[in-house]
Design a protein with these regions (language model features):
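Transmembrane helix-loop-helix hairpins at membrane boundaries of multipass inner-membrane proteins
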Residues: 1-8, 18-110, 184-200
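Residue-level recognition of transmembrane alpha-helices
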Residues: 9-13, 35-38, 84, 112, ...
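Juxtamembrane/interfacial segments at transmembrane-helix boundaries in multi-pass membrane proteins
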Residues: 52-69, 130, 137, 169-227, ...
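Hydrophobic residues within membrane-embedded alpha-helical segments of Major Facilitator Superfamily
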Residues: 12, 16, 41, 80, ...
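C-terminal ends of transmembrane helices
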Residues: 17-28, 89-101, 144-153, 221-234
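Alpha-helical multi-pass transmembrane bundles of energy-transducing inner-membrane proteins
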Residues: 26-28, 107-201
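Membrane-interface alpha-helices at helix entry/exit sites of multi-pass transporters
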Residues: 30-33, 157-160, 237-246
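Structural signature of hydrophobic alpha-helical transmembrane segments
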Residues: 2-12, 75-85, 128-141, 205-219
Length: 253
């Protein structure tokens, strides 16, 4: 399958989400068609990609010889992509009725769709740089959903979520620098990227980078001591809590 199809599950939900944000509040039918149509189309493309994997990754931009923004699909990313493709449409169906009582539906469904594209980007990342980009973009996309009610509890939960996510981002960034310094590439490759024959000092740096990456990415997985954002984020509408627990924690973390 053409590697350019990897862009569809990422960009299509983002475009439909942006379109939903521009609708008038009373255009419920049009909103539901846009949201469900974009999600189902993206999920169908994910299914097609899993059944007929592209022969090579799609490189979107290169930062020299060892860094790039690229998308790809292997066995593990296919599992996570299928998880998104199945869970998101079901949550959307539930949300259409649920959000009638919550208000600000355009805002909710706009960022709901955008988050689909961002999380699909996490699943389809073919390099550590790409994963980091979408991983941090997921924080920005889900923050308006966590703070949907905009009351005291929601604002507090949003601030905690943002601060812990920024702390995790900083730790991962430092670990990427170390891996770029001592590794062979930042692409996801079979057999790993750590060369043989590293000195004791270089190995110590990489051990530290691993610990930073573990806790940095562990923020989304609610790893102790960075777990407190998850129960606080339960003030968000129920569909958001479901996705945070079932998708963001399981897959993003």
């Amino acid at each position: 399958m053409n590697p350019y199809y990897l862009l569809v599950p990422v960009l299509l939900p983002m475009v439909t989400g942006a379109a939903v944000l521009g609708l008038r509040p009373k255009e419920r039918r049009k909103r539901e068609i846009l949201v469900m149509g974009g999600i189902l189309a993206a999920s169908a493309v994910i299914g097609a990609l899993v059944l007929n994997r592209p022969g090579q990754p799609l490189v979107l931009y290169r930062f020299g010889s060892r860094m790039n923004i690229s998308l790809g699909l292997d066995g593990l990313s296919g599992v996570f992509a299928c998880l998104i493709a199945v869970l998101w449409p079901l949550t959307a169906l539930y949300s259409f009725e649920y959000m009638k009582h919550e208000g600000k539906e355009n805002k909710f469904f706009g960022y709901f769709s955008i988050t689909y594209g961002v999380v699909a980007g996490v699943a389809l990342s073919h390099s550590l740089i790409t994963l980091y980009f979408f991983y941090e973009l997921m924080t920005l996309a889900t923050l308006p959903l966590v703070m949907h009610a905009m009351d005291t509890r929601a604002i507090y939960a949003g601030k905690k979520y943002l601060l812990l996510s920024m702390a995790g981002a900083a730790m991962v960034f430092v670990s990427i620098i170390s891996l770029h310094e001592y590794g062979t590439t930042l692409d996801f490759t079979w057999g790993g990227v750590i060369p043989q024959g590293l000195s004791h000092e270089e190995r110590r740096h990489l051990y530290g980078a691993f610990i930073l990456a573990f806790f940095g990415f562990g923020v989304k997985a609610a790893v102790v001591p960075f777990h407190s954002w998850l129960p606080a984020a339960s003030v968000a509408p129920t569909p958001v809590s479901a996705l945070l627990h079932a998708v963001a924690v399981v897959k993003g973390g």
